[in-house]
Every structure is written in structure tokens, then in C-alpha cells.
Curated annotation (Swiss-Prot):
Name by which UniProt lists this protein: Succinyl-diaminopimelate desuccinylase
GO molecular function: acetylornithine deacetylase activity; cobalt ion binding; succinyl-diaminopimelate desuccinylase activity; zinc ion binding
Co-factor(s): Zn(2+); Co(2+)
The encoding gene: dapE
Pathway: Amino-acid biosynthesis; L-lysine biosynthesis via DAP pathway; LL-2,6-diaminopimelate from (S)-tetrahydrodipicolinate (succinylase route): step 3/3
Length: 375
């Protein structure tokens, strides 16, 4: 008999849910949850489907995730069609297998098994699911969180099913994430002929010393939980494409991944002071993607570590590396937030895959976390 986790994962992978299109994934999950006594509240915004579901009352443990996936790329490069889940040599292939339909299947089956074993569980088990995580992430978890906070909804613990593992399932648990803020900088000059530089003002030349200082600045030294803040230039643009025109504008986009040693306000102040010091004529727009968050050792981290040690027989590393996740929004509710999911080696790649056995193991870990916190 096929494993129920693998069966559900395959059902979800068959749905081509390119962000923010859910393609029917949430309906599958909702039917399974309603069948075991969950109350389900759709919370849709714009083009995005979300739902908040709960069973029981009291101290609340939520499982969070997303049904949307990234584009497949050239499908001819895949060994099998990306939305036709295939098992080869013990690996489940398909877009979303690792990020993160495998986790969603593991969560739902864990909930089914938990409710069967503990029909009168003492706490509240909840699900927070969105179809807008991989792309804009503006109508998904952030808006659900805002709506829940507005009505003072309780959330004590949240397990996000992002693919946190590196080499084997459970070897890495994310108990925090760095913040992310992007600067869109326009430096203004005067366009002119390259043969008459005295009649122009080259913004690229003016900007180079400032950019050099940005690149060489040590923004902080990090701390025991976070690496040092990093700044990376992502995009540059100047000029008309002609070799005889001095550009009149220079656009620079750069991003900070910052630790809890800094705030977004501190970064803004330091960057703007630097630009003023170099006497640049500029306009600057900031886009804050998320604040850093950290969940210290406590009930949730301990439960997750215990579950991994029990089923994987390894002690996971607690790390805050990598990109942002929806955990940054959920942390605003005051909840302890931890990420535990499959191996991330193939996420967003051609031939995305996950060990089928890992999903079964992951579901058991999720169930044990439920048992430790709300049984």
C-alpha cells in the first residue's frame, strides 16, 4: 500500500500551482482537515488564496506553508514532466516536491494521525497556508497575519515547513532568519558628449568612491546566532548604449541581509550619511522585505530537536542562514517560530526531488512535535 504522505504529495504536485495560482491544492488540504474536525476560514486577498484552519482551543501550535511553486524552466531539461510526480530510485521528482508540497503532505498526514491518537487534545492545532510565497508575497501570509493580529488571535508556536535540511532530513533547523532591505539608488548627473567632459557631470565617476565605501564597510560583526550583516550590489545601470555619451543618470540597487545587531533604521541612516559625505545628488528608495527574527531555546525549539533526535538519530544544527521566509511575518505575532523541512539541494532547480522516505520521516517528526506541545 502506498504511503499516505507520498500519495498526498503526489496529488499536490500534479497541480501546476505557479505563484500565486493555487490550482486546487488548498481544496485538497481543506477537505482532509475538515474531515478530522478542523474549522477552516478562507482568507483570500487579491489573486491569492489563503486559509486559516484550527481544531481545539488554548495554547496554539500552527503549521505554516505555501502551495505555490516557482516556474519549471525549460521542461525538456527535466527527466520527467515537472507536474507528473514520478518516483525513481527512491526519489520523488516534481516541481514542489521539496519546496514545499512534500512538507504540506507531511503536515496534513501528521495532523490526521495525531487527531486519531488524541481526539481530545488539550491545545489548539492550526494551519496557515498561502499561495503567495514564491513571488510577490504581498497578499499571502503577511495579510493573514495582519488580519489575525487585528482580532487578537492567539499563536504560541509555529512550525514552517520550508526545506531547511542540507544533507539529510533534520540536520538543520532554522530558528531565525536575517532581515532583508533593498536600496534603489538613483545618482543624478548631467548628460553630455564624452569629448566635452567639462560640459557634463558623470554620475558613475562621482559614485565610485561612495560605492567602494559601501562595499568595504564592516556593518556589524554579527553575534552568536547571526553571521555579520552583508551588503551586496545586485544591479547597475547607466548610459544610453552609445560610446560617445556621458550618462546623466546612474542606477544602483543593493541589498542588505542584516542581523539583530542592526535595525532597518540604522542601515538607512548610515547609508544616507555616507552618500551625503560624498556630496552626491541622489534619490533613494528603500524596500524592507522583512525584519530579522530569532527563536531562542524554549518549548518549540526543544520539541523540534527532540523529534529530530528521536526519528533521525541526529542532533540538528540551529541556524539562521539563507534567505527570507514567511516566518518573518509570523514572528510579528509574538510566536516562537522554527523551520523544519526536507533537504533543499534541488529547490528551484530542474529535476527538483526529495527522498520519499524523508517525507515519511518528516511527517513522524511533525506528529511528535504536536504530541509534545498540545497533546
Amino acid at each position: 500500500m502506498i504511503c499516505p504522505v507520498i500519495d498526498l504529495a503526489q496529488q499536490l504536485i500534479k497541480r501546476p500551482s505557479l505563484s500565486p495560482n493555487d490550482a486546487g491544492c488548498q481544496e485538497i488540504m481543506i477537505q482532509r482537515l475538515e474531515a478530522i474536525g478542523f474549522t477552516v476560514e478562507p482568507m483570500n486577498f487579491g489573486d491569492t488564496l489563503n486559509f486559516w484552519a484550527w481544531r481545539g482551543e488554548g495554547e496554539t501550535l500552527a503549521f505554516a506553508g505555501h502551495t505555490d511553486v516557482v516556474p519549471t524552466g525549460d521542461e525538456s531539461h527535466w527527466c520527467s514532466p515537472p507536474f507528473e510526480p514520478t518516483i525513481r530510485d527512491g526519489m520523488l521528482y516534481g516541481r514542489g516536491a521539496a519546496d514545499m508540497k512534500g512538507s504540506l503532505a507531511a503536515m496534513v498526514v501528521a495532523a490526521e494521525r495525531f487527531v486519531a491518537a488524541h481526539p481530545n487534545h488539550k491545545g489548539r492545532l492550526a494551519f496557515m497556508i498561502t499561495s503567495d510565497e514564491e513571488a510577490k508575497a504581498i497578499n499571502g501570509t503577511v495579510k493573514v497575519v495582519n488580519a489575525l493580529m487585528a482580532r487578537h488571535e492567539r499563536l504560541d508556536y509555529c512550525l514552517v515547513g520550508e526545506p531547511s535540511s542540507t544533507d539529510r532530513v533534520g540536520d538543520v533547523v532554522k530558528n531565525g532568519r536575517r532581515g532583508s532591505i533593498t536600496a534603489n539608488l538613483h545618482i543624478h548627473g548631467i548628460q553630455g558628449h564624452v569629448a566635452y567632459p567639462h560640459l557634463a557631470d558623470n554620475p558613475v565617476h562621482r559614485a565610485i568612491p561612495a560605492l567602494n565605501e559601501l562595499v568595504t564597510t564592516q556593518w556589524d560583526e554579527g553575534n552568536e546566532f547571526f553571521p555579520a550583516t552583508s551588503m551586496q550590489i545586485a544591479n547597475l545601470h547607466a548610459g544610453t548604449g552609445s560610446n560617445n555619451v556621458i550618462p546623466g543618470e546612474f542606477y544602483v540597487q543593493f541589498n542588505f541581509r542584516f542581523s539583530t545587531e542592526l535595525t532597518d533604521s540604522m542601515i538607512k541612516q548610515r547609508v544616507e550619511a555616507l552618500l551625503e559625505r560624498h556630496q552626491l545628488d541622489y534619490t533613494l528608495e528603500w524596500v524592507l522585505s522583512g525584519q530579522p527574527f530569532l527563536t531562542a531555546r524554549g518549548a518549540l525549539v526543544d520539541a523540534v530537536v527532540n523529534a529530530v533526535e528521536h526519528y533521525a538519530e541526529i542532533t540538528p544544527q540551529l541556524l539562521t542562514t539563507g534567505g527570507t521566509s514567511d516566518g518573518r511575518f509570523i514572528a510579528l505575532m509574538g510566536a516562537q517560530v522554527v523551520e523544519l523541512g526536507p533537504v533543499n539541494a534541488t529547490i528551484h532547480k530542474v529535476n527538483e526531488c526529495v527522498h520519499a522516505a524523508d517525507l515519511q520521516l518528516l511527517s513522524r517528526m511533525y506528529q511528535k512535535i504536536m504530541e509534545q506541545l498540545i497533546a
